């Protein structure tokens, strides 16, 4: 069976893009994603399928304009005081439309021109539009680089990566948001940013990971005692009610 090299261009672009959407989270890490109209949601990696003891997490491949923040958490730590400042994320310079346009060119316009046999001029025109869009986005990043905490050298590396590998440019918003260090932990940020169902999902994820850690830590250790003391904070209300009835 002979494989045409040209037929691999589309899968290669998709693979590079998905690779850049892929995160490996520590057992004490999660992400906060800012979606439509500023609504936040949280995400954990896969508990049952790990790579090097890290949990795989795939950012939404069809929503590249959503900022993603990586946060740490420790269920056994004392609850953090309510923050006095907004979430630690600088307003991006309206990169969403440009990133969405890069995504559309890569996965709609370019395949249509290439596989639709529209001719070399059409393909070159699409590529010119793609790199013009990336260049405009990079100019906007350069002008707001201080808000993103980017030095000149860091911006240079970022610009080289997205120009050398255009699929990475579709993840420009995520690359910038993940670059920022967030000094607020998940358990402090979640009650402030998430609605009730999303917060309940975070509590369920934390509770499951507490149970996982209790299975491996030494029984009776200080860590185990701290985790057992913290566990009720993340249990569903009905579970706490049942425990209260059992104790009486």
Q: Predicted segment positions?
A:
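Transmembrane-cytosolic junction motif
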Residues: 18-40, 134-155
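Long, highly hydrophobic alpha-helical transmembrane signal-anchor segments
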Residues: 1-34, 111-129
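Transmembrane helical hairpin unit
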Residues: 74-187
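Weak global preference for isoleucine
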Residues: 3, 9, 13, 105, ...
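Broad hydrophobic/π-residue packing in well-ordered secondary structure
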Residues: 37-48, 133, 140, 225, ...
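Charged, low-complexity cytosol-facing tails and large interhelical loops of integral membrane proteins
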Residues: 153-248
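Membrane-interface amphipathic/juxtamembrane segments adjacent to transmembrane helices
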Residues: 21-71
């Amino acid at each position: 069976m002979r494989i045409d090299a040209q037929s691999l261009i589309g899968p290669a672009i998709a693979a590079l893009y998905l690779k850049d959407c892929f995160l490996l989270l520590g057992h004490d890490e999660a992400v906060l994603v800012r979606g439509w109209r500023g609504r936040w949601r949280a995400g954990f990696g896969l508990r049952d399928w790990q790579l090097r003891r890290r949990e795989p997490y795939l950012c939404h491949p069809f929503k590249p304009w959503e900022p993603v923040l990586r946060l740490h958490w420790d269920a056994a730590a004392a609850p953090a005081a309510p923050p006095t400042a907004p979430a630690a994320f600088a307003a991006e310079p309206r990169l969403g439309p440009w990133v969405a346009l890069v995504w559309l060119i890569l996965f709609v316009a370019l395949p249509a021109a290439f596989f639709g046999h529209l001719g070399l001029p059409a393909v070159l025109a699409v590529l010119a539009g793609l790199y013009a869009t990336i260049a405009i986005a990079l100019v906007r990043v350069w002008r707001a680089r201080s808000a993103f905490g980017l030095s000149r050298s860091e911006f240079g590396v970022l610009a080289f990566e997205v120009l050398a590998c255009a699929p990475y440019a579709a993840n420009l918003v995520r690359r910038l948001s993940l670059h920022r260090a967030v000094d607020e932990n998940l358990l402090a940020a979640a009650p402030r940013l998430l609605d009730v169902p999303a917060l309940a999902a975070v509590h369920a994820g934390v509770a499951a990971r507490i149970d996982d850690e209790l299975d491996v830590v030494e029984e009776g250790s200080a860590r185990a005692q701290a985790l057992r003391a913290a566990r009720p904070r993340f249990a569903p209300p009905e579970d706490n009610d049942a425990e209260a009835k059992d104790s009486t």
